[in-house]
């Protein structure tokens, strides 16, 4: 298994952390428990807690499914845009920095 450490991976880690912060803040504002949001989202409590921590396992940023990204804000009574940070990381950096032959 390869460990990613490029700038795009740091950007993704920061982005995942911001999503986690937003999820936690919105859950607290709605006075809901992990169990409440997990149940309403169709997730396990454990999975929901991982998303709120921003990590799927230590050192690995959370990477929620599209379904989870749509279900969690609905469970919280907010829009998807309330969860997603405004600045989207450019995940193409590795591709853009590769030599032209690597793109063929």
Q: Where on the chain are the PLM-derived regions?
A:
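Short, charged recognition helix plus adjacent turn
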Residues: 2-6, 74, 81-104
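A short, Lys/Arg-rich alpha-helix, primarily the initiator
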Residues: 2-31
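Residues within the helices of the helix-turn-helix
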Residues: 24-25, 35, 70
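Alpha-helical residues within the helix-turn-helix
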Residues: 28, 39, 74
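Short alpha-helical DNA-recognition segment
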Residues: 31-57
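DNA major-groove recognition helix of helix-turn-helix
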Residues: 52, 68, 76, 84-87
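Short, basic-rich loop-to-helix N-cap that marks the start of a DNA-contacting helix
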Residues: 55-74
């Amino acid at each position: 298994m390869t460990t990613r450490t490029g700038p795009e991976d740091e950007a993704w880690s920061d982005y995942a952390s911001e999503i986690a912060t937003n999820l936690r803040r919105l859950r607290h504002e709605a006075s809901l428990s992990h169990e409440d949001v997990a149940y309403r989202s169709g997730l396990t409590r454990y999975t929901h807690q991982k998303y709120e921590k921003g990590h799927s396992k230590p050192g690995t940023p959370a990477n929620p499914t599209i379904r989870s990204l749509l279900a969690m804000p609905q469970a919280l009574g907010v829009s998807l845009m309330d969860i997603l940070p405004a600045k989207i990381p450019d995940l193409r950096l590795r591709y853009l920095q590769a030599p032209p032959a690597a793109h063929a």
